[in-house]
A protein has these predicted regions:
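Membrane-interfacial terminal anchoring regions of lipid-handling membrane enzymes
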Residues: 1-184
């Protein structure tokens, strides 16, 4: 998040969503996944002094110091390729509620050459429509996107909902890279 703070329950849900997505959208059979729960991941982060928790009247808050947050960008960039396509799909819904399936594929085709240049992405350009469809299937399977009427459109969850927050957080992972593409 922009202030490097998130409620404990929100973080648990976001971690679970990410684990579910990684199991459904497999980058490669060579990628190994830890057999950890969200609480295991949080505990490990605390042991590494990467995150800490404080008690707030509204519940526990997990936060990261500014110095640590800068270092964490290295780790984010190390694994971003695993979720780049689903996160790019999610990014297309940050501002809009609904998008035609064909338009979404066109947008991903438009940015894919830039993404491939910056990240270790294994797919060739001619394969990206199929990969985008796999990402869409994974995102609908975990409930952070749904099909509109007659399956011609994709629809994000209701604004303010837990699923909308998860979609926003996933999409935000690609925003810095997409901003660089736009500026360059």
């Amino acid at each position: 998040t922009p202030k490097q703070k998130i409620g404990l329950n929100e973080l648990r849900r976001q971690l679970q969503m990410t684990l579910d997505l990684l199991h459904r959208f497999k980058y490669s059979d060579l990628v190994t996944m830890p057999d950890w729960t969200p609480d295991d991941i949080i505990e490990h982060g605390e042991q590494l002094n990467a995150i800490s928790r404080t008690t707030h009247p509204m519940g526990e808050v997990i936060h990261m110091e500014e110095r640590t947050a800068v270092l964490m960008t290295y780790f984010r960039n190390n694994i971003l390729h695993l979720l780049a396509v689903p996160a790019s799909v999610a990014c297309c819904f940050i501002q809009g509620q609904e998008l035609e399936h064909a338009e979404l594929r066109r947008l991903i085709r438009l940015i894919y050459p830039f993404m491939k240049k910056e990240l270790f992405l294994k797919w060739d350009f001619e394969d990206i429509d199929g990969v985008t469809n796999e990402a869409i299937s994974a995102l609908t399977d975990i409930g952070i996107l749904s099909y509109g009427k007659r399956k011609k459109t994709l629809v994000r969850p209701r604004a303010g909902s837990e699923k909308a927050f998860q979609l926003l957080m996933l999409g935000q992972a690609m925003v810095p890279m997409l901003q660089r593409f736009y500026l360059v």
